[in-house]
Amino acid sequence: MSSKYIVIEGLEGAGKTTARNLVVETLKSLGVTDMTFTREPGGTVLAEKLRSLVLDIKSVGDEVITDNAEVLLFYAARVQLVETVIKPALARGEWVIGDRHDLSTQAYQGGGRGIDRQLLATLRQAVLGDFAPDLTLYLDVDPRIGLERARARGELDRIEQESLDFFNRTRARYLELAAADPRIITIDACQPLEAVSHDIRATVTRWVQEQQ
């Protein structure tokens, strides 16, 4: 089977790390052994520096990062990761498992921030062209629950400190985009962990079998 790019998406506290481990475990059980793991923003030396700039609330002192500057920083980190890590890994025949990709920008900056859809579409086309994940698992969680989980982990980053309304708008855009794209599968992450784990394993297994 040819290499594939699988991405895990969701709000803070949705359980992306646990989901990634389940995806990897399931893929290994199906015979997939060569995998590369990425996160966004980040994943390269340059992209990690950009991650720090955009997420670390102390990185720019009292200077306010504008919404447009924020989205451009995300795309700068993304193109560096795609061109230097993801595409080369896929070309080597490896499967790539990503923690976030462009859907995050469409949801957080498009939904949460309210950035113009056409601007985001133009940026996406310029940076990524037709490149997209083969499968995206969107872990849907109520923002209140997700934020409670995130706070329990410790200090929140700049975006995690946004208002509940921001995350409600972000979730609404996630759901809208997921409903419109058959490559995005929504997992109910408000369920007990055992049920979420079952859904992830079943979804990945079914999808891989369909690719054969």
UniProtKB/Swiss-Prot annotation:
EC number: 2.7.4.9
One GO cellular component, as annotated: cytosol
Keyword Transit peptide set for record: no
GO BP term, example: dTTP biosynthetic process
Pfam families, per database record: Thymidylate_kin
Catalytic activity: dTMP + ATP = dTDP + ADP
Keyword terms, alphabetized: ATP-binding, Kinase, Nucleotide biosynthesis, Nucleotide-binding, Transferase
Residues reported to bind ATP: G10, L11, E12, G13, A14, G15, K16, T17
Xref: InterPro entries: P-loop_NTPase, Thymidylate_kin-like_dom, Thymidylate_kin_CS, Thymidylate_kinase
Source organism, top-level taxon: Bacteria
Family from the record: Belongs to the thymidylate kinase family.
Protein purpose: Phosphorylation of dTMP to form dTDP in both de novo and salvage pathways of dTTP synthesis.
Protein name: Thymidylate kinase
Organism name: Cronobacter sakazakii (strain ATCC BAA-894)
Gene giving rise to this polypeptide: tmk
